[in-house]
Each structure stands twice: as C-alpha cells, then as structure tokens.
Amino acid sequence: MREPANNTRAYRQPAVLLWLLGLLLCAIVIGRTSFTADLSAFLPRSPSAEQRVLVDQLREGLVSRLILIGIEGGGGDDAATTRAALSRQLAATLRADAQFSAINNGEPVSEARDRQFVFEHRYVLSPAVTPQRFSAEGLHQALGDSLDLLASSAGLVAKNMLPHDPTGEVAALVSQLDSTALPSLSNGVWASRDGKRAVLVAQTSAAGSDTDAQARAIDTVRRAFDAAVRATPNAASAKLLMTGPGVFSVDTRDTIKHDVERLSALSLVLIVALLLTVYRSPRTLVLGLLPVLSGVAAGVAAVSIGFGTVHGLTLGFGTTLIGEAVDYSIYLFVQSAGTHTVRPADSLRAWIATYWPTIRLGVLTSVCGFASMLFSGFPGLVQLGLYSIVGLVTAAMVTRYVLPHLRGAHVEIRDVAKLGAWLARATQAAPRLRWTLVLTLVGACAALALHRDGLWSRELAALSPVPAHSQALDASLRADVGAPDVRYLVVIPGASEQAALQGAEKVAAQLQPLVDTGALAGFENPARYLPSDATQRARLASLPPADVLTERMRAAVEDQPIRVKPELFTPFIADVAAARAQPLLRRADLQGTSMALAVDALLTERDGQWSAMLPLRAPSIDKASTQTANPPSLNAAAIRTAVEHANLPGALFVDLKAEADRLYVNYVREDIRLALAGFVAIALLLWVALRSAQRTLRALAPLVAAVLVVTAGFALASVQLTILHLVGMLLIVAVGSNYALFFNQRTGTSQPSQPAAQTLVSLLVANLATVAGFGLLAFSRVPMLETFGLTVGPGAMLALVFAAILAPKAAPDQHTAA
C-alpha cells in the first residue's frame, strides 16, 4: 500500500473520490426522500382486513380525534361557579375555531336544532314507521300510548306535541338519541362525578395521526384557557388538564425529542471526551465520526430507493443500531498508532494485515444478524434490516479505504502502554473466573426456566410510551365524560354510500336481539341518523294518503282513556301529507346538528370504498366487580354469529385491543424466528471463516452468555420482554462479536494469541463509547428508550468481560510478544 497522502493529495485518491461521489448521490436521494409515520409500514405485507381497520382507527378514527379537558381549582366562595364560567368561555372560544369540529361541555348549543331536525324528519328516521303502525289498529294503539304519557312527568311536552305527533315518533327518537350516559351537570355544564372538576370534550378537525395539527389544537386550547382565566374573576388558581390520543402523541413526541437531545448531547460529550483523551487531536476525532455519518447517509438513501419512503421508526432504530460503526475508527486509530520507531505507513500495513480480517469478519457477522430481517413479512422490519446492513458495510468500507488517506502520515495518540499492560495482566487473569461465569449462567438459566410462562409480554400496551400518571388521568377523565372506548367495532364495507348504509341496517337488525337479551349494552349506527334511501322510501310508503289517514284517525280516537276529537289531529294529517311529498333525507341535511358529527365518524370513504362502522358497547358490570375484575368484554362468538346471519360479504367484527395484541404477538414471534435464523447464519459464517468448530464455539459463547444474563436480569426484575429487548439483544451480538473475535485471533501461528496491548485498549475504548451511547438511554423518561438502554448498555459490557474470561490461553512465547 502507498504512503497515506495528506492535504489536497488525499482527495485525489480514487477511494476518496468515490466516497465523496457517493455522499453527493446520497444527499441528492435524501433531499427527495419523504419520511412517514404511517403505521401501515409496520403492517404485514398482506395484512388482514382486521389489521387494516385497526390502523385506520388509530390514524383517523373518532377516538383518535378526541381531546378530553378538565378544569380544576378556581378560587372564591363558589369554585364550582368559577369552573362553570371558565368552561363556558373556553367552549365558546373553541367553537369559533375551525381546528375543532365539535365542542361539548353540556350546554344545549345544538339541542334546539337537533329537536327541530328530528321533528321535521321523524317519519324517515323512526324505525317504528311501518304499514301496521299506520293502520287503524296501529294508530289506535299508538294514540293510546301517547295519551297515557299525559299523566306522566312528560305530560306537558306530550300535550303540546299530541296534535302533530299522536304516534309519539319524536318522543321515541329523542329518547333513542339520548340513550347514552352523559356526565352530571353542575351550574349548567358538565362536571365530574364528585363535582370537583368541570369537563369538556373537544373533537379536532384533523386526524389523530396528524401530530403537528394536534399540537396546534392543544396549544389553542391552552391559550384559550389562559384568556378565560384572565377574564374570569377568582380564576387565577384554576388548572387545565388535557388527555387523549392526540395529547399523548404530542407529549410523547416532545418528550422523546427532549430526551434524545439531552441524552445525545450528554453521550456525545462523554464520547468526545473519551476519544479526545485517547486521540489528543480534534482532527482525528472528526475523522473518526466520518464512517458513522457516511453509514447513516447510505442507509437512508438505500431505504428510500428500495421503499420510496423512510419510516420514522426505522430511522430512529437504525441510527441507534449503526452506533456500532464508531468502533471501526477506534480500532483503526488505536491499533495502528505508530511509535517513534515505526513508520506510519508500516504501522497501517500491519493493521490491515493483522486486524482488518478480524474486523471484516465482525462486520459480516453483524450483517448476517441483520440480514435475517430482510425475510420478514413486515415491511418495517425489512426497512430496519436494510438500513442497518447498508450503514454498517458503508462505515466499515470508509474506515478501511478512506480514513487511511484522510488521516495523514503523522497520527499519534496518547501513549497507552501502561493501560495496555494493565489490561494484559487482567486478561491473563480473567480465565480464573470461568467457574464463576458457569455458576452465573446456571443461575440465569434457572431464572429463565422459572419465569418462562411470563417471560414475553403479549400486549401492545407493553410498548406504550405514556407514563402511568398520564394513563391514570386519562382513565379518570374518560369516566367523567363517558367518552367512547370504541374497542369493539362491526365494519361493513360497501361499493357506495347507500350500499354501506343498507349493510349497516341489516347488521343492526341482527344485533338488536342481543341488546334486548342484555348480551350487548348497545351500539351506534350511522343509519340511525341517515337511513338508506331504500329504508326511507319504505317508511314513506307506509304513510297513507290524507283522506285515508283522516278516516283511520276517526276510528283511532274511539275507546281511548281520554276523550279527544278527531279534529285535534288536523296538524298531524298535514304533516304526514308534507312528509310524503318531501325529498329523501341527504347527508347535507344534517349539517349543523350533532348527528352530522356521528355520521361523519361512522360513515367514511377511502379510495372509492365506503365503510359503515357500528361501535359496540359491552354490558356494564357492578361497581364492586370492576375493582377486582377486568373491564367487561363481549361474547365475540355471539357477535360474529349475528354478523354472519346478515349475509354481508366482507362484514367484520373487530376487537381492536385483541387485534393490536395479536399483531404485536405476531411481531414478537416473527422476530424470534428471524433472530434464531440470524444466529444460525452467524454460527455457519464463523465456522467457515475460522475453520474450527472449537474456535466457533469460543467466539459464540460470550455472546450467548451475555444475552442469557441480561435476559435473566429482566426476568428477575419482573420485566416482561418486548420486541425492543429482542432488537437490543441483536445489537449485543453485533457489537460483542468484535470483542469475541479479537480474543480468539490468530497471528501467524496455529495457536490463538494474547491480544496486543493496543488491541486491548481499543476494545476498552470502543466498549466505553458503546456504553456511553446506549447506556445513557436507561435514564430516559420514555419507556421505549429506557428499555433499549437497559438492554444494550449492560449487554455490551458483559460481552467484553465474558470474551476475556472465555478467551483461550495463549502460547508462552506469545505472552512475551504481547
């Protein structure tokens, strides 16, 4: 190899020119890359219909757009009055903002419009409108029921409505629409059950997946509340509470951003301080980071070319995984450091001949581990695997072929002879701890055997980045406002809006018997507010002509408990005649009513395909049992049978929580299989490269031991493993393979050699850099980052220690050489 060039000569080297050209191409690709957070990237390649429904609800469902608001405190003699005033002013401000499609706080803002709408369209909305109901016998029975209401608490309202609605359609519809449980009222607005909190429900216009829009909406709520506090007497001590999917998303994003910035800055300071202590040169430090930056650029570009977009999770995980690349430059600069008696070029040639083959084998080992992800059925894992492979290979190639030219001819690092000598003595003594390691592994295996049933988490909630106190506040506010859980859904596809509505009506007819028997507490249905055209026509056809209806009403008033004259119902006959002539109800007619919001949420269209959704409510259980049992669940078999009886192809009953957990379990199983396949590939690679089963086992043993001990530690701490732990273990193997290979390295003899002092120092520095980079994540407030830090930090350190303990004994003459 030629003498490493310096100054401008380095940039005329073919390898450097090719590297610069590659960076330019990567920059062009990255500049045109779109980054996405769409969860469909982490669906299987061929997702089930249920999984599609799950992602649609997470992205754009009604619940994803809800912000639950609480107002606590408020000074003065009557804090409840202060909170009510704040609630009214806050609601009024938000209702005028286009960012919100609905604001509910208990005020009867749309009640008058809703009642007028129901009154005007009662004969197309009421499921009771049938030919039988408007026969002479049916009218007689309906009129009798309405007359009975005159003696009840609703008598005044019934008396006023009787001339227009003797069949009681309005009363039945209003009762049906108001059937859901509402929060209690205090001073005219919603309040918590204990009366210590005013509550509101805001529905954003933007989808829940639009985090930026959700952040703007949340900021609007805060500013509106602050303005209301300033304008309301005795309100200075009032406190605003918010929760909901959008709030969680924004808070999590901000927390992750803050933690990543804080911990990254701290880890960067530690790594820079560590490397400067060894390198003594800022220039060498900057050069050492070039392989990492090059790997990141190449990884992003490769995924962009292969998939069209780069998922945010892939970028986050991949950037963390590629942290292994910083080790390569450490090996180069420390292991090839020249002395006053050795020319830099000779030292570099010796490094390439002696150490590069081992590093290259370590890179291939890491590639084998990550390559297993390329066979995943989940595009998200394929992205992660491709990103890591391209990044690591690029970083290794830059270290081998570019850095030698850029570093110059005169590179000296701090004299590490004393540290190397101490590490050599420690390494020689390390094998004495083998029996201690054996006992540790026996204990780890015993712990894993005892905790095998609960070792892996089977619920997606295990990955939740939401802190426990935020989850508790969410549960409290949901209980206060009765917000929908929307765990259970029946989804009916349709080629058109009318087809979806007709399907919803058929399924509703099958579900109603379950409500009548108590197997189902109730369900929502878009066709309740917007019946299909066919149903509307059938109901209008049930209305008799005016002359026929007049004669039937004369018969209906006979033998009633209260005597009424047929002439009293002239307005009723006129209303029926008007209904027969009016056009069919359309979606636009609901504008301005609360029912329009329900239809918009339950009847959706995407890519020309319509879907009607029927959220189901599980039967309630008594308060005592809720303290000891799980929340109520539905009889899934009965629901599916009812849906099947509707004879609608494509109709689905979906338990969103169960589907999310099932999807997560599939991820875990897929990852375990791929991890095992990757481990087998690594073993085969080492066996071929090392040409010895014994050396292969020696190289693998420290990695397996580190993974076992880390896993046992989680089991003993009662921490269930998740997909994040598994990815962390894969990184332990990737990083630890370099340590194990160096301790099993041969240098021109048939026997393994004791690692040289500079090699031991390079391994220690690389390990400390890895621990600084990953270990600090253990102090993150975000559970996902904390999990990754607790896995990789200790695992990397244990891999180095175990590699030293299990290293083969060196030949006597090689001790002297070392």
Describe each model-derived feature in a short phrase.
Residues 285-331, 695-742, 775:
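Hydrophobic transmembrane alpha-helices and their membrane-interface caps
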Residues 2-37, 404-459:
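Signature of alpha-helical transmembrane segments and their immediate interfacial
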Residues 27-29, 85-198, 213, 235, ...:
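Alpha-helical transmembrane helix bundles of large polytopic membrane transport and channel proteins
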